[in-house]
Amino acid sequence: MSHLVENNILSENGLRVLSLFDGISCGRIALDRAGFKVKDYYAYEIEQNAIKISRYNYPSIYQCGDVFDEDFSKYDGIDLLIGGSPCQFWASSKCSKTAKKKREVKPDGEGWNLFMQYVRALHESKPKYFLYENNYGIGEEIQAAITKELCVEPVLLDSQLVSAQRRKRL
């Protein structure tokens, strides 16, 4: 990791991280386990039980609320933007018949609106690096639209590489 600091990619003081749809701060856990020092971690999450767990594990995390209520330009030049908008709108596996009928397969609807908040944060915060993740089972049309919005091709990973679960992630 020292070559990242030498090349001025990471600050010696630690990363400044903006996390959308933070959940229980698994992004922070992953950064810690990878050996990255984190200076500031700004979390956007609205699920109160997830926030309680995050606060218990990481009292220093700044809990910032709802992504819809924020002007992300105040994070201009942040080191890392991470996030994965809620996947229940796009997931295909293990869905009930009712859920499958409501599953979004086109880039519109509530799931798409949440994803576009990530895109807005990306444009407003202009991070040095970003990571967006979601489930493998999203529809091809949505995946193509995400690729177009982010201007990068997805990389397929199986979460069993880093956890006790077998779940394909993009």
Go through each PLM region and give its residues:
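Conserved active-site and SAM-binding loop architecture
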Residues: 1-170
